[in-house]
Design a protein with these regions (language model features):
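Conserved SAM-binding loop
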Residues: 223
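Local beta-strand N-terminus motif with an aromatic residue
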Residues: 214-215
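Hydrophobic beta-strand segment of the Class I
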Residues: 218-219
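Nucleic-acid modification enzymes, centered on SAM-dependent nucleic-acid methyltransferases
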Residues: 1-211, 227-229
């Protein structure tokens, strides 16, 4: 986020006493944590043993996923997950316990947007002095440790959640244009008599059970998760 977009706030200043709300955040977390744990909101699973071996975050006692977030970050992220769970239950109650395929698709993209916010609000997110913006935790494909970190202000109107949702929507719109039909058809998947029908197959690239010259595109995606872990 561009610091100049924070309204009348100056670009930087020394912290004041009233800026230190750590005690209030810790107290609020203590009240909510039992409920959130019961609802499976808190990411309290252990980080995989292969992750950074005995280097990086492990040297500083970060062994559980929730330790990757400062208390105020954790509080904000858990609130967003809680609201998402409430939205899911509301949709279920409105549809006799079921969720339509359209709602499922919309909820999926909301989770992608929320996940994007997680990437930029951790104790391993950093300030890019060149771009003058926050860099996400996976900027270096690893869980590095930072003595100081950058973060976004999620509750300011027009920033963070609004930005993340717009970014997700933009990516979805571009994918629809690439793989769409009619006037939205783009060169990636040209119409060739199949009436614009797109079939996506998922499997191992080592052995594709498909005849030669039968597909338009084969995508071999790198194992990003394994790379980071």
């Amino acid at each position: 986020a561009d610091p100049s977009s924070f309204g009348d706030f100056p670009r930087s200043r020394a912290p004041r006493v009233e800026d230190d709300v750590e005690a209030q955040v810790q107290a609020a977390l203590a009240v909510k944590i039992p409920e959130w744990q019961a609802r499976n909101v808190v990411p309290d699973e252990e980080i995989g043993e292969l992750s950074n071996y005995d280097r990086g975050h492990r040297l500083y006692g970060i062994r559980i996923w929730k330790d990757m977030f400062a208390p105020r970050q954790m509080y904000g992220h858990c609130i967003s997950v809680e609201l998402f769970q409430d939205l899911v239950e509301e949709l279920r109650s409105q549809n006799g316990g079921a969720i339509s395929q359209l709602d499922r698709a919309a909820l999926t993209y909301i989770t992608i947007a929320l996940d994007k916010v997680l990437n930029y609000n951790t104790i391993a997110s950093r300030w890019d002095v060149v771009r003058q913006a926050i860099r996400g935790i996976f900027d270096r494909h690893g869980f590095g440790f930072l003595w100081s970190f950058g973060e976004m202000a999620p509750t300011i109107t027009g920033l963070v959640y609004d930005w993340s949702i717009k970014q997700t929507g933009k990516a979805l719109e571009e994918l629809i244009e690439l793989a769409g039909s009619g006037d939205t058809m783009k060169p990636m998947l040209p119409r060739n008599g199949s009436n614009g029908r797109v079939e996506v197959l998922f499997g191992s690239a080592d052995a594709l059970p498909l005849p030669d010259a039968s597909v338009d595109c084969t995508v071999i995606d790198p194992p990003y998760y394994d790379n980071v872990m």
